[in-house]
C-alpha cells in the first residue's frame, strides 16, 4: 500500500441537461468501456420515459427514488477475540449515494425488459414508489444492521 497521502476527491461536474451532479454520477455508473455518449443517451432516454409515465419532473422522481434506495445503516465485519462480528455502523453521506447508485444500476441490469433504457426507467419508477429490488436491497441491509444491534458497542 502507498505511504503517500490519500488522493484528493475530484469534483463531479453537473450534467448539462439537468444541472445535477447526481445525474452525472448515474451516467458514470451506467457507462461501460468509456462510452459516455451511449451512457448519457440511456440515462436521458430513461428520464424521458419517466416524465411520460408520471407527468412529473424526471429529476424529482429520480431524487425520490434515490432517497428510498440509499441506506442509513450497514454492517461491517470486526474481528474481536478470534471471532468476526457484524457490527452495525452509520453510512457516510458520500457512501450512501455511491451504494444507492451502485444498487440501482446493478439491479436495473438484471431486469427483464428489452433495453437498458427501459430497465433503468422501470427500476427508478419502482424505487420512487418504494417497491422494487433496489429498495428491497436497502431493507435487507437495514434488517441485517437491526439483527446485529447487540454488537453495536464494538463500533470503532
Curated annotation (Swiss-Prot):
<comment type="subunit">
    <text>Part of the 30S ribosomal subunit. Contacts proteins S9 and S11.</text>
</comment>
<dbReference type="InterPro" id="IPR020606">
    <property type="entry name" value="Ribosomal_uS7_CS"/>
</dbReference>
<keyword id="KW-0687">Ribonucleoprotein</keyword>
<dbReference type="InterPro" id="IPR023798">
    <property type="entry name" value="Ribosomal_uS7_dom"/>
</dbReference>
<dbReference type="InterPro" id="IPR005717">
    <property type="entry name" value="Ribosomal_uS7_bac/org-type"/>
</dbReference>
<keyword id="KW-0689">Ribosomal protein</keyword>
<comment type="similarity">
    <text>Belongs to the universal ribosomal protein uS7 family.</text>
</comment>
<dbReference type="GO" id="GO:0003735">
    <property type="term" value="F:structural constituent of ribosome"/>
</dbReference>
<keyword id="KW-0694">RNA-binding</keyword>
<protein>
    <recommendedName>
        <fullName>Small ribosomal subunit protein uS7</fullName>
    </recommendedName>
</protein>
<keyword id="KW-0820">tRNA-binding</keyword>
<keyword id="KW-0699">rRNA-binding</keyword>
<dbReference type="GO" id="GO:0006412">
    <property type="term" value="P:translation"/>
</dbReference>
<dbReference type="GO" id="GO:0019843">
    <property type="term" value="F:rRNA binding"/>
</dbReference>
<dbReference type="InterPro" id="IPR000235">
    <property type="entry name" value="Ribosomal_uS7"/>
</dbReference>
<comment type="function">
    <text>One of the primary rRNA binding proteins, it binds directly to 16S rRNA where it nucleates assembly of the head domain of the 30S subunit. Is located at the subunit interface close to the decoding center, probably blocks exit of the E-site tRNA.</text>
</comment>
<dbReference type="Pfam" id="PF00177">
    <property type="entry name" value="Ribosomal_S7"/>
</dbReference>
<dbReference type="InterPro" id="IPR036823">
    <property type="entry name" value="Ribosomal_uS7_dom_sf"/>
</dbReference>
<dbReference type="GO" id="GO:0000049">
    <property type="term" value="F:tRNA binding"/>
</dbReference>
<dbReference type="GO" id="GO:0015935">
    <property type="term" value="C:small ribosomal subunit"/>
</dbReference>
